[in-house]
Amino acid sequence: MRRDLRGRKVRTIAVFATVGALLLAGCSGDDGDKADPTTTSTTVGSSTPPTTGSSAEKLHILVSNDDGYAADGIDALVQGLGDLDNVDVVVVAPRDQQSGQGGRTTLGPLAVTDVTTKSGYPAKAVAGFPADSVRVALDELKVEADVVITGINAGQNLGPILDVSGTVGAARAAVARGIPALAVSQGSGAPEYQYEVAVPAVLDWVRDHREQLLDGTLDPVVTNLNVPSCAKGQMRGLAEVPTDPDGDATASIGSQDCASTVAFSPEMGEVEAFVNGYATINEVPAEPKTPADVYPAGGATTSTSAG
């Protein structure tokens, strides 16, 4: 069965062997550059679902994000997932940049457009919030999914900012429908977002949980993975730590010191571990603390991530 991270300070620290080499590579491209749609917009009701595999052994992965279908992070994720054996990857993501939207959803029909990611992978672009994209994919397009992976987000999502994250909000929309989800974010603060460092961590997680995902024994929870971007040094390891909703808000959005000499300890919180160069992984609540925490004045069209 799955490892229960709730209520635990630390379960393990594991260093990815490939990180050193990967840090030598850089990411290129601007998330603001949109790929050209290949067809005109349609409404949800008339969209054709993306083709999914039929093999019982094939793992079906739905990918979404909050930075939009043309972002570098989602493209790096999709390319990385292609290295896995016997998987079917479907991309349904927001048409536009939707960071900081939490679990907001839209009432009524939404336009869905056939597009491609930056590298040319087929995708569906939804004219709505991140949680809308997952809702549309699962409820309207009837995409088959054993797991939903959201990201790779441009910027960490941890500590007190967790509940405003569209990356987490989209993952919560999957969990509300009984599907396990992995929310993945790459830290900010280095000259470039090092998405290539997060990809191996995602692939390791999928490989570790593949059989449980296929046989339906992995609990439908949101697993939140944050990977540092290192201006100097290398990612120092992977820390399984509880969420830290009362952590330092300023530090939670700051840079990461991968050259830090601060030793890891079981007393470290999520934010402290991350800013000292550790990737962090934990389970987050399926719902935000209160709607007001996610939807400040001005509000959302709905009050939960379920849609």
Give residue ranges: language-model regions.
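A cross-family phosphate/adenosyl-ligand binding-site feature
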Residues: 57, 79-133, 144
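Electrostatically charged, flexible surface regions
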Residues: 196-307
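C-terminal motif of bacterial Sec signal peptides marking the signal peptidase cleavage site
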Residues: 23-26
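Charged helix-capping and loop-helix junction motifs
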Residues: 163-169
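N-terminal low-complexity, Pro/Thr/Ser-rich intrinsically disordered segments
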Residues: 43-62, 302-303, 307
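Bacterial N-terminal signal peptides that target proteins for export
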Residues: 2-14
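Active-site-proximal beta-strand/loop segments in catalytic clefts of secreted hydrolases
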Residues: 64-67, 92-97, 127-129, 151-154, ...
